[in-house]
Amino acid sequence: MRNKYYTSRDPIKNYFPLPNEVFALGLSPGALAVYSYLMYIEDRTTYQCHASYKTIGNAVNMSPNTVRKYVTELVERGLIQTEHTSIITQDGRKQNGSLLYTLLPIQFSIQQFYEQKLAKLDTECEQERIRKRLEAFQLAQQKNACPPA
């Protein structure tokens, strides 16, 4: 009785994979929405898709400039790669087409993310070590200073 109210779902056609590791990368919510949409429209065999900023913006309810900002963030994080395309119109003119997005393997982005974290931690440790040495040097100078005569 209960099953007749639910439509049958084809798990191959009605879903798209979103790696769990994406949530550990610290992406902004807008970048996550844009990445999710690109995963939704990608060709699963070539890992590529064509979409304009306007099309993505309409899908995720953002302006094209905001989409451009989040696409830049995704490129910097190493999640996607963009390539400019061009089209030839019927009257023979060459015009800019939409971007070709290539979704890169998530493992590279995760490795880059953790390498950046480790580099930041190393820098902070080095700064702390230098601060302690400077404090010790200043304290030693104060102890060795001659009292005024």
Which residues make up each language-model segment?
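Short recognition helix of helix-turn-helix/winged-helix DNA-binding domains
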Residues: 1-66, 94
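Winged-helix/helix-turn-helix nucleic-acid-interaction surface
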Residues: 65-134
